[in-house]
Amino acid sequence: MLCTAVRVHAPEFADEAGIYKTAYLNHPCTQWARETRINYRFAVRLFKAMNDEYVWRFPRRSGGVVNTGHASMRHFDALVEAEKYIPDVSNFMTPHPQCFSGWDECKTDEEWPIVAYRAFYALDKMEFARYNKGRTMPTWMNPMPDWQERIYDEDSDS
């Protein structure tokens, strides 16, 4: 998404830097990232933080090789440099999109969708979430959603 933002605003730079080709051009988060420089800057910082978490969770790759980061990090320096090509039209981030179709009950009117994404993950992503290697489950992540409680309650009645 960041590479696409750069390709939209600075295709020559993108080609010279050898960053990924355009992908997800019309995805709401891709549009958001390229809308303003401050949005883009936040997305770059999030990209770095996500890579740091990835390295922390998986310090070794198969064969015992030290994990120095996701392969996409090879584009990080170019993405940082490319910030100057993103329109500097606001001192504030624009409202971040809430991209989880089929879960409208989770969406909020807030400009920053933390509450909405927490609800979405607690309702739909619980089955794959694992908290190990020193990470504890966030307090907002209900370990037993209401639907599971109802199933267990029904089982105990029979």
Tell what function each PLM region has.
Residues 1-158:
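Sequence termini and other peripheral, non-core segments
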